[in-house]
Amino acid sequence: MAQTMLLTANAKVDLRSKESLVERLKPKPLSSLFLPSLPLRFSSSTTNFSSSKFTSTTVALFKSKAKAPPKKVAPPKEKQKVEDGIFGTSGGIGFTKQNELFVGRVAMIGFAASLLGEAITGKGILAQLNLETGIPIYEAEPLLLFFILFNLLGAIGALGDRGRFIDDPAPATGLEKAVIPPGKSFKSALGLSEGGPLFGFTKANELFVGRLAQLGIAFSIIGEIITGKGALAQLNFETGVPINEIEPLLLFNIAFFFFAAINPGTGKFITDEEED
């Protein structure tokens, strides 16, 4: 009995320092690889001390995906508005600047021809067409009144002027302009535009001159209806003379209108659909 007690005393197991065999053989969870292991304590005081000393930290295996910044959406471009007529009737009857340019060219030729005819014959444009003149305006021919009204409204843009004219790209300068490609005409050798106008006349300038011609022919007809005199006679120009005796200023104006009508201006006509 005494020997048994001695063996038991000598074989005392230190449970605080070493884990038991059962604890070693237990399968350990995956979290024990990442979390710090806590020593096993049996006393309540030791357990409270160790829990307050060691705190468990959570380790994330996969980081959350960073959100991409929102894409900046560019504000929509404002659509350029086409020029309206003077009464806000832009294109109301399908009249565009290209149509107005054609009407202006016809008016330039007609106005120049009427001035030249009056200078040579001494008769105004209506007298040359054997129409009655020297009467009140309300007694004039209805077709003639419509022609006058059409020219006046077209000259001030009241018929509508959809679209616009844009200039051609700038020509080459410096060395590129000095080099003359083979097979070009005499205009290129002088540094002038090959296919465009001779003096840089644009379609916008041509449109303006056409409007002036429309105003001129309309007012000359109105004056001739009322007074019975042509446009030159109203301005006290000498008429009924040979062409070589016509005033130089008058000849210059006639030649200018003829030249502006037949010489194509630079630039091109675009509409809203072509801009889009």
Curated annotation (Swiss-Prot):
Record's protein name: Photosystem II 22 kDa protein, chloroplastic
Subcellular localization: Plastid, Chloroplast thylakoid membrane
Top-level taxon of origin: Eukaryota
UniProt similarity note: Belongs to the ELIP/psbS family.
The species this protein was found in: Solanum sogarandinum
Function: Seems to be involved in non-photochemical quenching, a process maintains the balance between dissipation and utilization of light energy to minimize generation of oxidizing molecules, thereby protecting the plant against photo-oxidative damage.
Keywords: Chloroplast, Membrane, Photosynthesis, Photosystem II, Plastid, Repeat, Thylakoid, Transit peptide, Transmembrane, Transmembrane helix
InterPro entries named among the record's database cross-references: Chloroa_b-bind
Family matches, as Gene3D superfamilies: Chlorophyll a/b binding protein domain
Lineage of producing organism: Eukaryota, Viridiplantae, Streptophyta, Embryophyta, Tracheophyta
GO BP terms: photosynthesis
Ranges of the Sequence repeats in the UniProt entry: 62-168, 169-276
GO CC, one annotated term: photosystem II
Organelle transit peptide: 1-67
Residues annotated as transmembrane: 106-126, 140-160, 207-227, 242-262
Membrane topology, as annotated: Multi-pass membrane protein
